[in-house]
């Protein structure tokens, strides 16, 4: 059972996924810092409040902390945009790879040449 587990863990997909999760977590903390320390103060300058996370709407005893929600939305938009750019770059790279592999191999070129010579000899 331990051997099977080692085989499972050693597979590329599991390792790639683990690396992706770790990098994603690190990237999320960078984006949160970007939003909290740079973007929110910039937005706060325009609306007259420096800390958006403290924006609260109080109705009776209920408090709606929409500032924290705005932070989460900004985080989501930035992360989604960066992921979109990464996927777009990967797809562009894959298309270039596909174009490279579409060129016929040397063997195929020789076979075509032989076929053409055989056709000429039959005529």
From Swiss-Prot:
Keywords of this entry: Cell membrane, Ion channel, Ion transport, Membrane, Transmembrane, Transmembrane helix, Transport
PROSITE patterns tied to this protein: MSCL
Location(s) in or outside the cell: Cell membrane
Protein's membrane topology: Multi-pass membrane protein
Disulfide bonds: none
One GO CC term on file: plasma membrane
GO MF: mechanosensitive monoatomic ion channel activity
Primary location class: membrane
Transmembrane intervals: 14-34, 67-87
Function according to Swiss-Prot or TrEMBL: Channel that opens in response to stretch forces in the membrane lipid bilayer. May participate in the regulation of osmotic pressure changes within the cell.
Family according to the record: Belongs to the MscL family.
Subunit and partners: Homopentamer.
UniProt name for this protein: Large-conductance mechanosensitive channel
Organism: Limosilactobacillus reuteri (strain DSM 20016) (Lactobacillus reuteri)
Name of the coding gene: mscL
């Amino acid at each position: 059972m331990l051997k099977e587990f080692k085989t499972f863990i050693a597979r590329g997909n599991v390792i790639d996924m683990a690396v992706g999760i770790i990098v994603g977590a690190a990237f999320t903390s960078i984006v949160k810092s970007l939003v909290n320390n740079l973007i929110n103060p910039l937005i706060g300058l325009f609306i007259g409040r420096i800390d958006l996370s403290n924006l609260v709407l109080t109705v009776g005893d209920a408090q709606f902390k929409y500032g924290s929600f705005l932070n989460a939305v900004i985080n989501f938009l930035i992360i989604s945009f960066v992921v979109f750019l990464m996927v777009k770059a990967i797809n562009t790279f894959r298309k270039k790879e596909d174009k490279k592999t579409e060129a016929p191999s040397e063997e195929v070129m020789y076979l075509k040449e032989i076929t053409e010579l055989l056709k000429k000899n039959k005529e």
